[in-house]
A protein has these predicted regions:
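Carbohydrate-recognition beta-sandwich/jelly-roll modules
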Residues: 1-285, 290
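Acidic, His- and aromatic-enriched active-site or binding-groove loops in soluble protein domains
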Residues: 293-295
């Protein structure tokens, strides 16, 4: 493990371009190797956003497994209304004084973006006075977030991490910080929505329904996420050698149908069943050749 300050040589220069101004820093020499990278921290003129870029230059001599940068913000006030937002599953808001400890290991897939640990590639922190920021990872493919919140706080620290792609860091990594005033969790979500819309990546429910009218049937339904068959392979990371009976499970389609009817009769209303592991190979095997259905 090395800190950026451990580099044998560190240089800085100011850079001025048509889009913004910032500081370019080059870090060379770690652990008697020639490994080097640069960072570019700059303010975008058009938006006022601050962009943090990490760029590999010479990857010889070190086998990098993780880069943790930018570091966590100072967010250490013991205030119930100082909150951290993460896109873990359906979304989580963590007050600084929350009694339950939260760490990266508690998050699905260690907070990896574009997974259940971070369905959208952003996190945010809001002060009680409405000041805050949203951090948007513009290169989320080999990235995620780390989080540290002790029981009862008084702080929550959150930062971005990057990992190699096919053995090397290989390409530029970028995180955009947008600073907000008079913000709440709704304002943060609207900021991200505006960000993706400006880049042509927003697809509204109305647009999706125009392509697939059955989308309209989902509105107002409760989402029930369940499975039929699971079969964890012996060479899988998730295989439990100590408890092999946990590597396989099976619930019949008839049992799932009865479960849905029972929930509905108890007043659950309109339901949408998300069914995993419905094919003979079991969850999560043989994609994309998943047929036939489980018998």
């Amino acid at each position: 493990t090395f800190a950026f300050a451990d580099a044998a040589s560190i240089t800085h220069e100011q850079r001025e371009t048509g889009t913004g101004t910032g500081i370019r820093s080059i870090f060379t020499g770690f652990g008697h190797s020639a490994y080097s990278f640069e960072t570019y921290v700059w303010v975008e003129r058009a938006s006022g956003d601050v962009l943090f870029e990490w760029i590999p230059l010479n990857e010889q001599g070190l086998n990098i497994t993780n880069v943790t940068w930018p570091a966590a913000m100072d967010f250490d006030c013991a205030d119930d209304h100082d909150t951290t937002l993460i896109t873990h599953e359906q979304g989580v808001m963590i007050p600084n004084t929350w009694p339950t400890a939260v760490s990266t290991k508690d998050i699905a897939f260690d907070g990896r973006f574009e997974t259940a640990g971070g369905y959208m590639p952003w996190f945010a922190q809001l002060r009680a006075d409405g000041h805050g920021y949203i951090a948007i990872c513009e290169t989320p493919w080999n990235a995620g977030y780390g989080i540290d919140h002790p029981s009862n706080g008084p702080y929550t620290h959150i930062n971005t991490w990057f990992e190699p792609s096919l053995g090397t860091m290989n390409y530029r990594r970028v995180v955009r910080y947008q600073f907000l005033d008079h913000a709440d969790h709704t304002a943060v979500c609207k900021a991200y929505r505006l960000y993706v819309n400006e880049r042509g990546r927003l697809r509204t429910l109305a647009e999706k329904a125009a392509r697939n009218p059955s989308v309209r049937d989902l509105i107002g339904r409760s989402w029930v996420h369940i499975g039929i068959k699971t079969k964890v392979q012996p060479d899988s990371y998730y295989y439990d050698k100590d408890h092999p009976e946990k590597n396989e499970s099976l619930v019949t389609f008839a049992q799932r149908e009865k479960q849905m009817r029972t929930l509905h009769s108890m007043g659950a209303g309109r339901l949408y069943m998300h069914l995993d592991g419905w094919a003979q190979p079991g969850y999560d095997n043989a994609h994309p050749d998943y047929l036939p259905a489980c018998q």
